[in-house]
Design a protein with these regions (language model features):
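A generic short-segment signal for beta-strand/edge and adjacent turn/coil regions
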Residues: 33-36, 63-66, 153-159
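Structural preference for beta-strand elements that scaffold enzyme active sites
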Residues: 16-18, 54, 61-67, 90-96, ...
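Internal, glycine-rich beta/alpha segment that forms the wall or movable "lid"
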Residues: 74-186
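Short, solvent-exposed turn/loop segments enriched in Gly/Ser/Thr/Pro and often Arg
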Residues: 18-25, 72, 98-101
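N-terminal beta1-alpha1-beta2 module of alpha/beta enzyme domains
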Residues: 1-58, 184-185
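Short, glycine/acidic-rich beta->alpha junctions
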Residues: 1, 47, 70-80
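The substrate-binding groove and active-site-proximal loops of carbohydrate-active enzymes
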Residues: 37-43, 63-75, 114-118
Length: 186
Protein backbone atom coordinates (compact mmCIF):
# COMPACT_ATOMS: atom_id res chain seq x y z
CA UNK A 1 0.00 0.00 0.00
CA UNK A 2 2.57 2.59 1.08
CA UNK A 3 4.96 2.15 -1.82
CA UNK A 4 2.09 2.13 -4.32
CA UNK A 5 0.69 5.32 -2.77
CA UNK A 6 4.10 7.00 -2.95
CA UNK A 7 4.57 6.00 -6.60
CA UNK A 8 1.12 7.31 -7.52
CA UNK A 9 1.76 10.65 -5.80
CA UNK A 10 5.22 10.93 -7.38
CA UNK A 11 3.87 10.18 -10.86
CA UNK A 12 1.01 12.65 -10.40
CA UNK A 13 3.48 15.43 -9.57
CA UNK A 14 2.72 15.90 -5.90
CA UNK A 15 5.43 17.83 -4.07
CA UNK A 16 5.20 16.03 -0.74
CA UNK A 17 3.37 13.59 1.48
CA UNK A 18 2.85 14.54 5.12
CA UNK A 19 2.56 11.68 7.60
CA UNK A 20 1.25 12.59 11.04
CA UNK A 21 2.19 10.41 13.97
CA UNK A 22 1.20 9.92 17.59
CA UNK A 23 2.61 7.73 20.33
CA UNK A 24 -0.72 6.96 21.93
CA UNK A 25 -4.32 6.22 21.09
CA UNK A 26 -6.42 9.14 19.95
CA UNK A 27 -8.76 8.93 22.92
CA UNK A 28 -9.84 12.55 23.31
CA UNK A 29 -13.39 11.89 22.05
CA UNK A 30 -15.37 10.57 25.03
CA UNK A 31 -12.15 9.41 26.68
CA UNK A 32 -11.73 6.29 24.57
CA UNK A 33 -10.28 5.33 21.16
CA UNK A 34 -13.48 3.82 19.71
CA UNK A 35 -14.10 6.57 17.14
CA UNK A 36 -10.46 6.52 16.00
CA UNK A 37 -10.57 2.75 15.56
CA UNK A 38 -13.95 2.74 13.84
CA UNK A 39 -12.89 5.41 11.32
CA UNK A 40 -9.16 4.54 11.07
CA UNK A 41 -8.42 8.09 12.22
CA UNK A 42 -4.79 7.97 13.34
CA UNK A 43 -5.19 4.36 14.37
CA UNK A 44 -3.85 1.97 13.29
CA UNK A 45 -0.63 3.87 12.60
CA UNK A 46 2.78 2.60 11.56
CA UNK A 47 6.12 4.24 12.29
CA UNK A 48 6.51 6.86 9.53
CA UNK A 49 10.31 6.79 9.73
CA UNK A 50 10.24 3.18 8.54
CA UNK A 51 7.51 3.76 5.96
CA UNK A 52 9.43 6.60 4.34
CA UNK A 53 12.50 4.40 3.91
CA UNK A 54 10.48 2.12 1.64
CA UNK A 55 8.59 4.93 -0.12
CA UNK A 56 11.77 6.86 -0.91
CA UNK A 57 13.23 3.84 -2.67
CA UNK A 58 10.42 3.83 -5.26
CA UNK A 59 10.14 7.59 -5.90
CA UNK A 60 12.27 10.29 -7.50
CA UNK A 61 10.72 13.63 -6.58
CA UNK A 62 8.17 13.20 -3.80
CA UNK A 63 9.15 14.83 -0.51
CA UNK A 64 8.21 13.39 2.86
CA UNK A 65 7.15 15.29 5.97
CA UNK A 66 7.20 13.26 9.16
CA UNK A 67 5.90 14.03 12.63
CA UNK A 68 8.30 13.17 15.45
CA UNK A 69 7.71 14.28 19.02
CA UNK A 70 10.40 16.16 20.92
CA UNK A 71 8.93 15.05 24.24
CA UNK A 72 9.65 11.36 24.66
CA UNK A 73 12.96 10.70 22.93
CA UNK A 74 16.52 11.79 23.38
CA UNK A 75 17.48 14.17 20.53
CA UNK A 76 20.54 12.15 19.54
CA UNK A 77 18.33 9.39 18.10
CA UNK A 78 16.03 11.44 15.82
CA UNK A 79 19.04 13.47 14.65
CA UNK A 80 20.63 10.27 13.42
CA UNK A 81 17.37 8.90 11.98
CA UNK A 82 16.63 12.08 10.03
CA UNK A 83 20.18 12.21 8.70
CA UNK A 84 19.81 8.65 7.42
CA UNK A 85 16.44 9.46 5.85
CA UNK A 86 17.84 12.60 4.26
CA UNK A 87 20.56 10.46 2.65
CA UNK A 88 18.04 7.82 1.52
CA UNK A 89 15.64 10.40 0.08
CA UNK A 90 18.44 12.51 -1.43
CA UNK A 91 17.28 15.59 0.46
CA UNK A 92 13.52 15.07 0.36
CA UNK A 93 12.77 14.89 4.09
CA UNK A 94 11.01 17.35 6.40
CA UNK A 95 10.36 17.24 10.14
CA UNK A 96 7.09 18.24 11.79
CA UNK A 97 8.20 18.84 15.39
CA UNK A 98 5.50 18.34 18.01
CA UNK A 99 5.46 18.18 21.80
CA UNK A 100 2.71 15.55 22.01
CA UNK A 101 -0.73 16.13 23.50
CA UNK A 102 -2.09 12.75 24.46
CA UNK A 103 -2.06 11.40 28.00
CA UNK A 104 -2.19 7.95 26.42
CA UNK A 105 1.21 8.62 24.82
CA UNK A 106 2.65 9.58 28.19
CA UNK A 107 1.24 6.43 29.76
CA UNK A 108 2.59 4.25 26.95
CA UNK A 109 6.05 5.63 27.63
CA UNK A 110 6.07 5.16 31.38
CA UNK A 111 4.55 8.35 32.76
CA UNK A 112 1.27 8.68 34.59
CA UNK A 113 0.18 11.67 32.50
CA UNK A 114 1.39 14.21 29.97
CA UNK A 115 4.15 16.58 31.06
CA UNK A 116 2.96 20.15 31.73
CA UNK A 117 2.65 22.36 28.64
CA UNK A 118 5.47 24.79 29.46
CA UNK A 119 7.86 21.98 30.40
CA UNK A 120 7.18 20.20 27.10
CA UNK A 121 7.97 23.36 25.16
CA UNK A 122 11.10 24.14 27.20
CA UNK A 123 12.33 20.58 26.63
CA UNK A 124 11.49 20.88 22.93
CA UNK A 125 13.58 24.03 22.63
CA UNK A 126 16.60 22.28 24.12
CA UNK A 127 15.85 19.23 21.94
CA UNK A 128 15.98 21.44 18.83
CA UNK A 129 19.17 23.12 20.07
CA UNK A 130 20.85 19.70 20.37
CA UNK A 131 19.73 18.49 16.93
CA UNK A 132 20.90 21.77 15.37
CA UNK A 133 24.32 21.41 16.99
CA UNK A 134 24.59 17.83 15.75
CA UNK A 135 23.54 18.67 12.19
CA UNK A 136 25.26 22.02 11.76
CA UNK A 137 28.09 22.14 14.28
CA UNK A 138 29.56 18.67 14.39
CA UNK A 139 30.93 17.98 10.91
CA UNK A 140 32.60 20.75 8.93
CA UNK A 141 31.44 21.17 5.35
CA UNK A 142 34.59 19.59 3.92
CA UNK A 143 35.15 16.94 6.62
CA UNK A 144 34.39 14.05 4.27
CA UNK A 145 36.92 13.56 1.48
CA UNK A 146 36.53 9.87 0.53
CA UNK A 147 40.21 9.89 -0.44
CA UNK A 148 40.92 6.21 -1.19
CA UNK A 149 44.49 6.85 -2.31
CA UNK A 150 45.42 8.18 1.14
CA UNK A 151 43.06 5.92 3.12
CA UNK A 152 41.18 8.94 4.41
CA UNK A 153 37.39 8.89 4.50
CA UNK A 154 37.00 11.90 6.76
CA UNK A 155 39.36 14.31 8.49
CA UNK A 156 39.17 13.81 12.28
CA UNK A 157 40.21 17.45 12.76
CA UNK A 158 36.99 18.53 11.04
CA UNK A 159 34.58 16.44 13.13
CA UNK A 160 33.75 18.03 16.48
CA UNK A 161 32.12 16.97 19.71
CA UNK A 162 29.19 19.27 20.43
CA UNK A 163 29.66 19.27 24.23
CA UNK A 164 26.02 20.00 25.00
CA UNK A 165 25.29 20.09 28.73
CA UNK A 166 21.75 21.30 29.25
CA UNK A 167 18.93 21.03 31.73
CA UNK A 168 17.44 17.90 30.15
CA UNK A 169 20.02 16.56 27.72
CA UNK A 170 23.71 15.73 27.89
CA UNK A 171 25.38 15.12 24.53
CA UNK A 172 29.16 15.30 24.70
CA UNK A 173 30.14 13.70 21.39
CA UNK A 174 29.97 14.36 17.67
CA UNK A 175 27.12 13.34 15.39
CA UNK A 176 27.67 9.76 14.25
CA UNK A 177 26.50 10.46 10.70
CA UNK A 178 28.21 12.47 8.02
CA UNK A 179 26.24 15.47 6.72
CA UNK A 180 23.29 14.68 4.49
CA UNK A 181 22.13 16.64 1.43
CA UNK A 182 20.15 19.16 3.51
CA UNK A 183 22.17 18.72 6.74
CA UNK A 184 19.07 19.89 8.64
CA UNK A 185 15.62 18.67 7.53
CA UNK A 186 13.18 21.29 6.30
Amino acid sequence: YWTTLAQQLDTAGFDALFIADALGQLDVWQGKPDAALRLAAQMPVNDPLLLVSAMAAVTQHLGFGITVSATYEHPYLPAREFTALDHLTRGRIAWNVVTSMLDSAARNLGLTRQLPHDERYDRAQEFLDVTAKLWEGSWEEDAVSRDKANSLYSDPQKVHAIQHHGRWYQVPDAHLSEPSPQRTPV
